[in-house]
Regions:
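Conserved beta-ketoacyl condensing-enzyme motif
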Residues: 13, 17-158, 187-198, 292-310
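Active-site-proximal alpha-helical scaffold in enzymes
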Residues: 73-86, 136-139, 144-188, 227-249, ...
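Glycine-/small-residue-rich "gating" segment that lines the acyl/pantetheine channel
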Residues: 120-127, 165-168, 172, 176, ...
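Active-site-adjacent elements of ketosynthase-type condensing enzymes
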Residues: 31-45, 108-110, 189-217, 259-279, ...
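Phosphate/pyrophosphate-binding loops at sites that engage ATP/ADP/AMP, CoA/4′-phosphopantetheine
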Residues: 80-94, 244-251, 281-297, 319-323
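ACP-dependent fatty acid/polyketide chain-elongation machinery
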Residues: 1-62, 242-254, 349-363, 408-412
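Flexible, low-complexity linker/loop segments at domain and module junctions
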Residues: 89-94, 288-294, 325, 374-412
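Condensing-enzyme catalytic core mediating Claisen C-C bond formation in acyl metabolism
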Residues: 2, 21-25, 35, 210-288, ...
Length: 412
């Protein structure tokens, strides 16, 4: 994974648990006229101290031809594939290995830059690499080409549910016997003038904490006023269970539930009654054959918006009933911001780590919880050790698209 806390799973996870925030002022462009000036950028550097060094993953000439969401996606995929030991499948193994990596927005910075260039200097100045360097499916395409993965080559585009949908859909392809191995997840890098302006004009971003960026993302807190844009990528390798066991693969968890729903309500606002979120979670539980009381930890969508946080919390309480008092729920967006199309995949990885290590990551800045938070452990301010055998991870997106994943501890 690549996140605003750094490059790699260990770096990001250790910093999440220690309560660090990836939020800061915008550095990519002059944001002095921007209403919202707080974002969570990937820390770029020479690779030391967890900084992201793109040269570790791509040749400079190749990197210049693509937008950063593709760079982040390739980097996260390389980490995942190397960790899984699946770097060079051959023959039928290659034909039964696929890719499903999506993005909510894709190459928006490059589109913006090329549009300005064309209008200022004419169409002949547009790069021949412009189209393949911005298309959302080109993360999957690049990874497929790089590792010779000849199975399903697909991309998901469902706004902020993209990463979760990609993992869930890829798991279903394996269940349907279309593949034995799928590289799946999401990548995003849309922090650019038009991207920030668009979300800000939609009144979606935090503006109250421009002078104290680390305080801006505060799910369920009474002082929340919008989400903080983030960027990065989260990629996992999914594998048919017997196939994984046969080759002695390291198994982090087992995907047992996947639920989807549509709000059919509004292009940006969630349905006020939370019914879409409720039905996605219920469908995931049904698919898993589990009761609400079987879930120990929920990684909430929890974006820090006044409306969305409240609605998700209500849906969780409605579905889980009395069992809600026994679980822990937190939002890692309080640390890394909202990674949009990459969020669901990154959060699924964090959830698996929480399960492996029996520790729930914290919800930062939850200093004054909303009254509706009573009766549920939202892991305020500090990580919490507790038994975690099964997790549920929520992702909800513009257009009313909802996804819930359930992953449980793997046992023989």
């Amino acid at each position: 994974m690549v996140t605003p806390l750094g490059d790699g799973v260990e770096t990001s996870w250790s910093r999440i648990l220690s309560g660090q925030s990836g939020a800061g002022e915008i550095t990519r462009f002059d944001a002095s006229n921007s209403v919202a000036r707080v974002v969570c950028e990937v820390p770029v550097g020479d690779g030391s101290n967890g900084t992201f060094n793109a040269d570790r993953y791509m040749e400079p000439k190749d990197r210049r031809r693509v937008d950063d969401f593709i760079v982040y996606g390739i980097a996260a995929a390389q980490q995942a594939i190397e960790d899984a030991g699946w770097t060079n499948p051959q023959g039928e193994e290659a034909e039964r290995s696929g890719v499903m990596i999506g993005s909510g927005i894709g190459g928006l910075p490059g589109i913006e830059e090329s549009s300005v260039l064309m209008h200022e200097r004419g169409p002949r100045r547009v790069s021949p690499h412009f189209i393949p360097g911005r298309l959302i499916n080109l993360v999957s395409g690049q990874v497929s080409i790089r590792y010779g993965l000849k199975g399903p080559n697909h991309a998901v585009v469902t706004a902020c549910s993209t990463g979760a949908h990609a993992i869930g859909d890829a798991a279903r392809l394996i269940m349907l016997d279309d593949a034995d191995v799928m590289v799946a997840g999401g990548a995003e890098a849309a922090i650019c003038p038009v991207g920030v302006a668009g979300f800000a004009q939609a009144k979606a971003l935090s503006t109250r904490y421009n002078d104290t960026p680390e305080k801006a993302s505060r799910p369920w807190d009474e002082g929340r006023d919008g989400f903080v844009m983030g960027e990065g990528a989260g990629i996992v390798v999914l594998e048919e269970l017997e196939h994984a066991k046969k080759r002695g693969a390291k198994i982090y968890g087992e995907i047992v539930g996947y639920g989807m729903s549509g709000d059919a309500y509004h292009v940006t606002a969630p349905a006020p009654d939370g019914d879409g979120a409720f039905r996605a979670m219920r469908a995931a539980l049904k698919r898993a054959g589990m009761a609400p009381s079987d879930i120990d930890y929920i990684n909430a969508h929890g974006t820090s918006t006044p409306l969305g946080d409240e609605i998700e919390l209500g849906a969780v309480k409605r579905l889980f009933g009395d069992a809600v008092s026994q679980l822990s729920m937190s939002s890692t967006k309080s640390s890394i911001g909202h990674l949009l199309g990459a969020a669901g995949a990154v959060e699924a990885i964090f959830s698996m780590l929480a399960m492996q290590q029996n520790i729930a990551p914290p919800t930062l800045n939850l200093e004054n919880p909303s009254p509706s938070c009573e009766g549920i452990d939202l892991v305020p301010l500090k990580a919490k050790e507790r038994p975690i055998r099964a997790i549920l991870s929520n992702s909800f997106g513009f257009g009313g698209t909802n996804a819930s994943l359930i992953i449980k501890e793997f046992t023989e």
